[in-house]
């Protein structure tokens, strides 16, 4: 009989000086690993300045470029467009009161208020017909009018009389073929109870309009009319379509008023002059001139008058207006610049106001957030948006130009300061504006060629250089215990082109080394 193996027992350790055996240790319990949730209960805070932020309200106001109503006037004229408004209204009043066809051609560079002004006139001066026929004026309007026509309105003449009109506004960009404009006009006015017709040319549209002669005047506004010439079709067909539209607006058997709008200043000379079989066939022309800097400034101030405060410094608005007026006179471009400066200002101030700026580590960043960021409002930054923020926006527009082109616009003093800034950056790549100014003073004193500028004059030129896209100025946190913020300056140019241009000027050579 074989012996049953006995599992050996572990020898119990005893303390060296103990008489009794030591108490056997308790068996170790395995610890359960605790895994924390990857997804936190809430996500990191997201900075915002509140839904009623003055910044958000200002940007929204600048977005509505078509709503340039003079709040202090009920006549429907846009700011700085009173003369053009009166010309359009006189044209409409005469054509509608006489129940005759006529045409008007409105032209001008982009952003001069052509579309906005016509939209304003249509909204304010063409009123929908009242549903109730109880008033004598309504009965008089509808006595000889087909109420089933679409877009039917009434137009009040200067003497108080009401005239029946049907008005529509069409953007020609949406048209695939120029000849489809006739069908588009018909679809805008057709009798809801009438048959569906195919309108392919002027004669078809004329046949539809003639029964309403002396009863209802049809007013058609064609925006971007020159697009009819750029469609994917032959120039002959495009020109023919445009000529037929203006010819239709001169026929005595219909009451058809055509208002064409386009950016092309020479469209009348190139195409409409072919109508000149008789001087009476040519459309009346109104030119919307580019806005001046003063007009742009007044429009912006007027738009912002509804806000509790204006967040821009007056000089910043004037500077932006002058730059935009000098280029194209496009008011929409000015709105874009102002909105862009607000966004830059917000980003910078949010960074400065953030209490967690620079304190997050990788363990605090959620890997798979499932809830939207917690929004927390912070005090809105004090102060107003100045020239430096406007300059940052303009610098983006000119950065595509070559360094040589940008330098050519500078005067000798501005070129000299640019040279000293570059030299200060060679000594210290993190140079601030103050350090660059100190280097400038030392360089001027050493050469004894020109009188040094004051600090505020130096800063003004730095702003100009930033506007030209040659330097960039950023507010950064300086190193050390003070933790204060300074304005760091840097350059954005092609150094080879820079030296090629600067070495051509003998007085600047000492500042290049």
UniProtKB/Swiss-Prot annotation:
Gene Ontology MF: a single term: DNA replication origin binding
Motif Nuclear localization signal: positions: 27-33
Pfam family, any one: Cdc6_C
Coarse class of the protein's main subcellular location: nucleus
Induction: Transcribed at the end of mitosis, but in cells with a prolonged G1 phase there is a second burst of transcription in late G1.
Annotated region described as Interaction with CDC4, given as residue ranges: 1-47
GO process annotations (BP): cell division; DNA replication initiation; G1/S transition of mitotic cell cycle; MCM complex loading; mitotic DNA replication checkpoint signaling; pre-replicative complex assembly involved in nuclear cell cycle DNA replication; regulation of DNA-templated DNA replication initiation
Alphabetized SMART domains for the sequence: AAA
Modified residues (Phosphothreonine): 368
The record's account of how the chain is modified after translation: Ubiquitinated by the E3 ubiquitin ligase complex SCF(CDC4), DIA2, and TOM1; and targeted to the 26S proteasome for degradation.
Subcellular location: Nucleus; Chromosome
Keyword Cell cycle attached: yes
Keywords: ATP-binding, Cell cycle, Cell division, Chromosome, DNA replication, Nucleotide-binding, Nucleus, Phosphoprotein, Ubl conjugation
A GO cellular component annotation in the UniProt record: nucleus
Gene3D superfamilies on file: 1.10.8.60, P-loop containing nucleotide triphosphate hydrolases (3.40.50.300), Winged helix-like DNA-binding domain superfamily/Winged helix DNA-binding domain (1.10.10.10)
Binding site for ATP: 108-115
Subunit structure: Associates with the ORC complex and the MCM2-7 helicase complex. Interacts with CDC4, CDC28, DIA2, ORC1, and TOM1.
Annotated family: Belongs to the CDC6/cdc18 family.
Function: Plays a crucial role in forming the pre-replicative complexes. Interacts with the origin recognition complex (ORC) and MCM2-7 helicase complex leading to the linking of those complexes and loading of the replicative helicase MCM2-7 onto the pre-replicative complexes. Required for the initiation of DNA replication and then actively participates in the suppression of nuclear division.
UniProt-recorded name of the protein: Cell division control protein 6
Species for this entry: Saccharomyces cerevisiae (strain ATCC 204508 / S288c)
Gene: CDC6
């Amino acid at each position: 009989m074989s012996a049953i193996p006995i599992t050996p027992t572990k020898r119990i350790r005893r303390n060296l000086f103990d008489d009794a055996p030591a108490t056997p240790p308790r068996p170790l319990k395995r610890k359960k690993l605790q895994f924390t949730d990857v997804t936190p209960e809430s996500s990191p805070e997201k900075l915002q300045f509140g839904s009623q932020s003055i910044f958000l309200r200002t940007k929204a106001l600048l977005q509505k470029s078509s709503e340039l109503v003079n709040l202090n006037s009920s006549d429907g004229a846009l700011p700085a467009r009173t003369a053009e408004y009166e010309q359009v209204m006189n044209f409409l009043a005469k054509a509608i009161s006489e129940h005759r066809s006529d045409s008007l051609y409105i032209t001008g560079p982009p952003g001069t208020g052509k579309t906005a002004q016509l939209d304003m006139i249509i909204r304010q001066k063409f009123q929908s017909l009242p549903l109730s026929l109880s008033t004598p004026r309504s009965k008089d309007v509808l006595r000889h009018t087909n109420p089933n026509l679409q877009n039917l309105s009434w137009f009040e003449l200067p003497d108080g009389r009401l005239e029946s009109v049907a008005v529509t506004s069409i953007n020609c960009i949406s048209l695939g073929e120029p000849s489809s404009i006739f069908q588009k006009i018909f679809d805008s006015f057709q009798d809801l109870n009438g048959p569906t017709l195919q309108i392919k040319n002027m004669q078809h549209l004329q046949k539809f309009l003639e029964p309403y002669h002396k009863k209802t005047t049809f007013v058609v506004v064609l925006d971007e009319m020159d697009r009819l010439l750029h469609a994917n079709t032959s120039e002959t067909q495009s020109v023919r379509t445009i000529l037929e539209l203006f010819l239709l607006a001169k026929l005595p058997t219909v009451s058809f008023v055509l208002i064409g709008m386009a950016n092309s200043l020479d469209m009348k000379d190139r195409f409409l002059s072919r109508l000149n079989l008789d001087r009476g066939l040519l459309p009346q022309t109104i030119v919307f001139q580019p806005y001046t800097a003063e007009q742009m400034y007044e429009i912006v101030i007027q738009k912002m008058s509804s806000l509790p405060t204006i967040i821009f410094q007056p000089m910043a608005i004037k500077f932006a207006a002058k730059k935009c007026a000098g280029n194209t006179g496009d008011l929409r471009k000015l709105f874009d610049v102002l909105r862009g400066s607000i966004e830059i200002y917000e980003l910078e101030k949010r960074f400065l106001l953030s209490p967690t700026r620079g304190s997050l580590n990788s363990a605090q960043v959620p890997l798979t957030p499932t809830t939207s960021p917690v929004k927390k409002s912070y005090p809105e930054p004090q102060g107003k948006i100045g020239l430096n923020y406007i300059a940052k926006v303009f610098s983006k527009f000119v950065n595509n130009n070559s360094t040589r082109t940008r330098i050519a616009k500078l005067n000798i003093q501005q070129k000299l300061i640019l040279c000293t800034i570059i030299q200060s950056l060679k000594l210290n790549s993190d140079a601030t504006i103050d350090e660059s100014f100190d280097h400038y003073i030392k360089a001027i004193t050493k050469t004894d060629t020109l009188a040094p500028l004051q600090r505020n004059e130096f800063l003004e030129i730095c702003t100009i250089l930033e506007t030209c896209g040659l330097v960039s100025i950023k507010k950064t946190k300086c190193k050390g215990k003070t933790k204060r913020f300074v304005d760091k300056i840097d350059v954005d140019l092609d150094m080879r082109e820079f030296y090629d241009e600067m070495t051509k000027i003998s007085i600047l050579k000492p500042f290049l080394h």
